[in-house]
């Protein structure tokens, strides 16, 4: 089953790569208006390719192309807890996030420089 998943992922990547390669950036020749029109059409094709790529990913791999957004409390209530090794090399991003929902006094105290 894993081999089949890898093969389908490789197919999806090849298809998406082919789509992007089939739409090279527009040439810089011609009048300003012609260049503008070519760029506009190129951007429109890029948007279509992006949506088709999302469809390919969701159908080939069985998952949405975009990650589900993380629900956070209002910004005013978020503070960072740096009491423990904040950003020690090798440990960044490891473990559970240290987000506390408290008063914003910690953020205000760091404004002096």
Swiss-Prot record:
Give the location of motif Nuclear localization signal and RNA-binding (RRE) in residue numbers: 31-47
Region (Homomultimerization), start-end ranges: 15-23
Q: Where is this motif: Nuclear export signal and binding to XPO1?
A: 70-81
> Residues where Phosphoserine occurs?
89, 96
Q: Does the keyword Phosphoprotein apply?
A: yes
Does the entry annotate any disulfide bonds, and if so which pairs? none
Q: What is its main location?
A: host cell
**This protein's UniProt keywords:** AIDS, Host cytoplasm, Host nucleus, Host-virus interaction, Methylation, mRNA transport, Phosphoprotein, RNA-binding, Transport
The transmembrane residues are none
Quote the PTM field.
Answer: Asymmetrically arginine dimethylated at one site by host PRMT6. Methylation impairs the RNA-binding activity and export of viral RNA from the nucleus to the cytoplasm. Phosphorylated by protein kinase CK2. Presence of, and maybe binding to the N-terminus of the regulatory beta subunit of CK2 is necessary for CK2-mediated Rev's phosphorylation.
Asked if the Swiss-Prot or TrEMBL record annotates the protein with the keyword Chaperone, the reply is: no
What's the domain of life for this entry?
Viruses
**Chain spans, region Disordered:** 17-45, 89-113
* Compartments reported by the entry: Host nucleus, Host nucleolus; Host cytoplasm
GO cellular component terms attached to this protein's record: host cell cytoplasm; host cell nucleolus
In which residue ranges is the amino acid composition biased (Basic residues)?
33-45
Biological process according to GO? mRNA transport
Instruction: Relate the assembly described in the record.
Output: Homomultimer; when bound to the RRE. Multimeric assembly is essential for activity and may involve XPO1. Binds to human KPNB1, XPO1, TNPO1, RANBP5 and IPO7. Interacts with the viral Integrase. Interacts with human KHDRBS1. Interacts with human NAP1; this interaction decreases Rev multimerization and stimulates its activity. Interacts with human DEAD-box helicases DDX3 and DDX24; these interactions may serve for viral RNA export to the cytoplasm and packaging, respectively.
Q: What role does this protein play?
A: Escorts unspliced or incompletely spliced viral pre-mRNAs (late transcripts) out of the nucleus of infected cells. These pre-mRNAs carry a recognition sequence called Rev responsive element (RRE) located in the env gene, that is not present in fully spliced viral mRNAs (early transcripts). This function is essential since most viral proteins are translated from unspliced or partially spliced pre-mRNAs which cannot exit the nucleus by the pathway used by fully processed cellular mRNAs. Rev itself is translated from a fully spliced mRNA that readily exits the nucleus.
- Misc note: HIV-1 lineages are divided in three main groups, M (for Major), O (for Outlier), and N (for New, or Non-M, Non-O). The vast majority of strains found worldwide belong to the group M. Group O seems to be endemic to and largely confined to Cameroon and neighboring countries in West Central Africa, where these viruses represent a small minority of HIV-1 strains. The group N is represented by a limited number of isolates from Cameroonian persons. The group M is further subdivided in 9 clades or subtypes (A to D, F to H, J and K).
* Domain comment as written in the entry: The RNA-binding motif binds to the RRE, a 240 bp stem-and-loop structure present in incompletely spliced viral pre-mRNAs. This region also contains the NLS which mediates nuclear localization via KPNB1 binding and, when the N-terminal sequence is present, nucleolar targeting. These overlapping functions prevent Rev bound to RRE from undesirable return to the nucleus. When Rev binds the RRE, the NLS becomes masked while the NES remains accessible. The leucine-rich NES mediates binding to human XPO1.
Q: So what family is this one in?
A: Belongs to the HIV-1 REV protein family.
This chain belongs to the protein called: Protein Rev
Q: Which organism is it from?
A: Human immunodeficiency virus type 1 group M subtype B (isolate JH32) (HIV-1)
